[in-house]
Every structure is written in structure tokens, then in C-alpha cells.
């Protein structure tokens, strides 16, 4: 059966509300109405995100689960500490609900109690697309109360749905900020299918739609890779050629009609390339597809972990949020469905991820290093030759020590002193344009990181230790393309 190469759309509604309620059934009905309203507005699956405190949190959890939403729990404290805020009956109800949660995460295990509640509330806002609140309109009675969470949501521009505790009226704030559709994920999903060959390996049997999705965004990135470095280098080379044409005309007293046209052709070509660089939108699309492909490659390589390792937990990139969320939720739901023995995981991960990436970085290092050596050597040779020609000209003008043939004099004293510094400047600029120093250092660093990870995995004896190494490795592998994403998302290329 052929898998569809698209990923599902997951919306998250965060929740905050009071513990003590005068009309709990009425509040429950208002919560139900608000969730139904959101589900009508946003296609795809909805996930509820909240704590599990008595009162409003419990009502929200029951209503979300009753409507078929998954429930993700963010506890401000470890369960043993969190339990102290409940009566026996309240905790019995909370335990029953926690058993139905798809995910339970303790956000903070070290802070003071009120600080922990505030941090958990802020994290709920951060992880949500829209925040649903049950609020009496009054200031918070302690740090981390509902009013504090609402204030934070307002400050960061998160859309709010507020249920008034007294009147049960539902009102909205900043509603236009809620994106029912994610254009980036829709763009990825709309890409045509890729040829069956190519793409990432799937050693742990991840869902077919993720593999198909990875192949098509990887195919798009590979076919649409922009040639911006080559274009920038071509502007430099065209300017150098224009300078050499002008220098030749002056040095050799050439007055051929073709020379001004040659220089004009070079300068017009450089201008055309510069304009092309400003108009080129392929760079941003390429980076988006490349980043999406690498996120999926990382997910496929780590699918065999028995627990839901939060590899992407700290990443919140513009345009990638729903893609990362889809991968995280799908991984979480399948974690442990097909258990993989530890030694099998180590062998497959090393073979299909570590060794594959190590070979890639070694290959790229082998390509970049000769370019760096050649350009650096060319710069020094051109610079030293320019100094030699200029010094010879200066000495000749002072002492006139020998008669020099006219042809040699034109080359040695006029053409080369002008052209060689320009060529040296072009060669050193090509090193920067091609980012060779950083790339060589990056490739060497990644080879060292991967070799160290290989050894750590070989000696790993527990899943916890393996998860730590895998998380560090995957984040290091993603760092390069994340940097490119930042450049193209927040800076204009000139």
C-alpha cells in the first residue's frame, strides 16, 4: 500500500483556569462550547495542553477527552509534590484522568512552588496555538495564577478565548492571530511525489507517510538548490575581468573599439547577476525544504527509541513549528509499538545515521579543503608578485639600472601592478564568498562529534545514556541548516 506523502495538522489549545468554581457544570458547558468552536475553525486534530489541577483543569481535561482530543499534561511539580495540593477525592479524580493522558511531562523539578506554577503556565502558553482561559477578571491571588498566565499570553500576542466565571460568556482576544492553516506545512504537503529512489533510510519502520514526505521535500531541496554562491562569485569575476580589460588598454596603449564593449559587457553582466540575486526567491524555499527534509531524516533515524525522546523540544522555528509538532506527536504515539533491542538500535543507528553522516562530512571536507588551499595560495602568489612588480618599478624609476624592452616594461611596470592586486583581492574574497574557512572548520568539528558519538554509543548500556547521545548528535547535525533558516528568515540577501 502506497503511503500519502503528507503530514497531519495538529492544533494545540492551552488551558488555564481557577481551582474554585461556583458553577462547575456551567463552566464545563462553556468549555465544551469553546472547544467545539475551535474544532470547527481549525481543520486537523486538536490537542489539549494543561496542568491537572483540581477545578477548571479537570473540567477542561474531561471535555477535551470527551470530544476526541488528545490531552497533554504539563505538571509544575513532580507528582509527589503536586499531590499535596489535592484532597483525597480530588487526587483520585486527577489520577484517573492522568491515566488517560497521551503525554505527562514535569516541566520544573527545582523551583519554588509558586515559581513552578508560573513557569508551567508560561510554558503552556508557549506550546499552544491558542489559549482557553476560565477567569473571573481579577488579579492573580498568588504568583502563577490565571491572571498572570493571561497577561503573559497577551504580551506575546497569543490568541485568547476567555470564559467569564460569573456570566459564562465567551469572548475572544487577538483572534486574528490564530492561524487555522499553516502555509508552510501546506506547501510541503502540496509538493509532488518524489521518485521512489533516494531520500533517507528507514531502519526502524517509521510510518510510510513520513518516509514519503521526507523523500519529496528532500527531492525538492536537491533539485532546487540555489546557486547563490556561484552567482556572487561570478559578479566578482566579472568585475575583475572588466578591470583587466581597462588595465590592458592603458598598459599596452590599445585603442581597439572592442575593448570598451568588452568592459561594458562584463559590468552589465555583473549588474544583471546582482539583480538576479535580489529577485531570487529559491534560496528561502530551498532552505525550508532542506530543513524539513533534515527534521524528517532525524525522526526516521531515531524512531527506534523506546521512549518519546524530545529531540526537537527546544526548537521553535518560524515556519517549522507544525512540522516539528507532527513528527513529535506521531513519534510519541508509535514509541514502543515495535520494540527494538538495544544492541539492534545501536547497530542500526550507527550504520544508517552516524556512519552515513560521517562519510558525508568527510567527503565535503575533501572537496572544500583543496579549494581553500588553492585560493589561499593564489592570493599569496598574486600579492607577492604585485609587490615584486611594484618594487621593480620603483627601483627602476630611481636608479634606471637597466634598459628594459618595451613589451616587458608594459607587462612588468603597468599591467601587472594594476591587475595582480585586483586578482589577489578577488581570490581572498572567493574564500569568504564560499565560506570556506567556516565550512572546513564545521566539517572537521562534525567529524569529531560523530566519531565521539560512535564511541559513546558503543559503550552505552542503558536507554537513558543512549537517548542523551542521540539527542546531542541530532541537534549537532541540525545546527547547520538551522543557521541557514535563521539567515533566510530574518535577513534579506543583497
Report the location of each language-model feature.
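Acidic/glycine-enriched connector segments
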Residues: 1-172
